[in-house]
């Protein structure tokens, strides 16, 4: 799997933009149920391939399911300290209302910016409030012209053989 040379993104995070493509797998089952904020999760195999310099934390960008419309997204990368996860995860909340789950679908994501580091929370309410603030901040950030351009990036229309996970950076 090729990983292209990294560059410094406009907001200072190395290795961005980061382009990810993989199958949506079942997560921990808490996004929709406990938090009311559904997420699409990448496989452990894909998570293990992300660049080491991508720190744990909350990111924003664009996402598309099964080559459908491109929507804003916010993504948590890390160990989710509140839940004391034993495995690193990438959980993508797509800012769009879907009528049903889409496990097994192909998810394409372009990670563009960093919002905050991963942290622990004292309560579930505090966690949900932080996630809602992340969603609002991501929504506002993606209205910037330099980020809006990525909504129509060729990555979202590339015809790539099914079943191939992709992690790549572009200069």
PLM-predicted stretches and their roles:
Residues 1-171:
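Phosphate/ribose-recognition catalytic cores of enzymes acting on nucleotide-derived substrates
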